[in-house]
Amino acid sequence: MNTYRTGLFSEFLARMYLRCHGFRIVKSRYITGRNTGRAEIDIIAKRRNLLIFVEVKHRPTLSDGWDAITARQSVRLRNAAENYIAKNAWRGDARFDVIVVCGWRIHWARGAI
């Protein structure tokens, strides 16, 4: 399996994992335009009054997953999230999470970015 397909499969696993934890998937692979530095949010999910923006990483080890998120990427994700919140007039709470998939293990860090 190539890296693109592995990434798609990891995102699928992350969506199923979030659903099992009571979240409804609002959007997958949300891409912003030029004005926000072109960023992609892997998953946007909602539970009650909480909206989460999730970055999914597939890595052989957990530490590789955390290291894969750079400061520049964090800024882009925040800008993309602000774009989504403004566009959809979201009034509830919001949070940035990271899900790292290592083989078949899923590690979910809440409020990680």
Question: Where do the PLM segments sit?
Answer:
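Solvent-exposed beta-strand sheet faces enriched in polar/charged residues
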Residues: R29, K57, D97-I99
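Conserved catalytic cores of phosphodiester-cleaving nucleases, focusing on short active-site segments
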Residues: I41-S63, L77
